[in-house]
Amino acid sequence: MKKTVTSWSFPHCDLKESVGLSKLLSINAIDIGYFYKSAIDKKTLLKDYSRIINDLQKFDIEYSNLYHLFGDTLGDRNLANKDSLDENSKDIETASKFCKELGIRSIFVLPGIINKNQSRKDAFIN
């Protein structure tokens, strides 16, 4: 069985610290994402992901998953909104290339569950 941990499991740790804790726990794979202190920079990933790859290759750990969010917030680019299709398609293509080059075999997609001017509570109810 393969064990992995999410970098955001340690929200106050940077990525180097998260990797260190993961290895201390004998977990040799870590998920990466765009939130908390361990975050990779999404704008950089979408613009020039080779810089992020160079930074990540410094750590002796496998990256098992990219936690990807469309847009900048949960309400920014909902997948159900066809007006976001072109931007979302471009972003997922770039994120996929990044993952392929780094050897990440899966992308966890957070699709944007909230529409503009809608609260999380309203989204859950409706």
PLM feature segments, named:
Residues F10, K43-T44, E87:
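Residues that cap or flank secondary-structure elements
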Residues K2-S7, I30-I32, Y63-H68, I107-V109:
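Hydrophobic faces of well-ordered beta-strands that scaffold small-molecule active sites
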Residues T6-S7, I40-D41, D83-S84, A123:
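A generic structural signal for short
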Residues L15-Y36, L102-G103:
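Catalytic domains of carbohydrate-active enzymes, especially glycoside hydrolases
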Residues S7-C13:
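Short polar catalytic/cofactor-binding loops
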Residues E17, D55-F59, L74-N126:
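Active-site acidic/histidine proton-transfer and metal-coordination neighborhood
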Residues D48-F70, I125-N126:
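Alpha-helix-loop-beta-strand connector modules within alpha/beta enzyme cores
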Residues D31-Q57, P111-Q118:
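Glycine-rich, proline-tolerant flexible connector loops at the mouths of alpha/beta enzymes
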